[in-house]
UniProtKB/Swiss-Prot annotation:
HAMAP family: TATA_bind_prot_arch (MF_00408). GO terms for biological process: DNA-templated transcription initiation. This is TATA-box-binding protein E. InterPro entries: TBP, TBP_archaea, TBP_dom_sf. Belongs to the TBP family. Keywords: DNA-binding, Repeat, Transcription, Transcription regulation. It comes from Halobacterium salinarum (strain ATCC 700922 / JCM 11081 / NRC-1) (Halobacterium halobium). NCBIfam families: PRK00394.1-2, PRK00394.1-5, PRK00394.2-2.
Length: 186
């Protein structure tokens, strides 16, 4: 049986940063090749990097959110590219702006089918939401690490809310040991 932790895959890393000054997004959009800016649709300018692949959402306030990266290293590299592009437009950007990871979304596989009804009862209603008529997954809120896990009948998991990659490993450990205690992983 494969260790479920070995199946963990980072699907998305979201991080935020800022350059400490307001921006004229209309003028940035005209000068920054490949930028998308349609304030009627979305208040920020979208700038996509290809390698690594991600999207930076740049707001008038100077705040920047990077999403779509597959690792924390990729987030930092993508934002470095964005900072360099802004500097090329003569926009002052500190040498090393603080980058804060806000959310890491991972997937994993427990490698067996899950009886979500039994799990919902076993885990207790205070930590879970399970309404199969509304959504096929069971929502399990963990306190430590502070993440939300979606469990599916297929045995697949989605873990969201992590701040670092090891949060997913801790969550998978906690979920598997809790389900084993309840005799629900046989």
């Amino acid at each position: 049986m494969t260790d479920p932790k070995e199946t963990i895959n980072i699907e998305n890393v979201v991080a935020s940063t800022g350059i400490g000054q307001e921006l004229d997004l209309q003028s940035v959009a005209m000068d920054l090749e490949g930028a998308d800016y349609d304030p009627e649709q979305f208040p920020g300018l979208v700038y996509r990097t290809q390698d690594p692949k991600s999207a930076a959402l740049i707001f008038r306030s100077g705040k920047i959110v990077c999403t779509g990266a597959k690792s924390t290293d990729d987030v930092h590299e993508s934002l470095r590219i964005v900072f360099d592009k802004l500097r090329e437009l003569s926009i002052k950007v500190e040498d090393d702006p603080e980058i804060v990871v806000q959310n890491i979304v991972t997937s994993a596989d427990l490698g067996r089918q899950l009886n979500l009804n039994a799990i919902a009862i076993g885990l207790g209603l205070e930590n879970i939401e399970y309404e199969p008529e509304q959504f096929p997954g069971l929502v399990y809120r963990l306190d430590d690490p502070e993440v939300v896990a979606l469990l599916f009948g297929s045995g697949k998991l989605v873990i969201t809310g992590g701040k670092e990659p090891k949060d997913a490993e801790h969550a998978v450990d906690k979920i598997t040991s809790r389900l084993e205690e309840l005799g629900l992983l046989d």
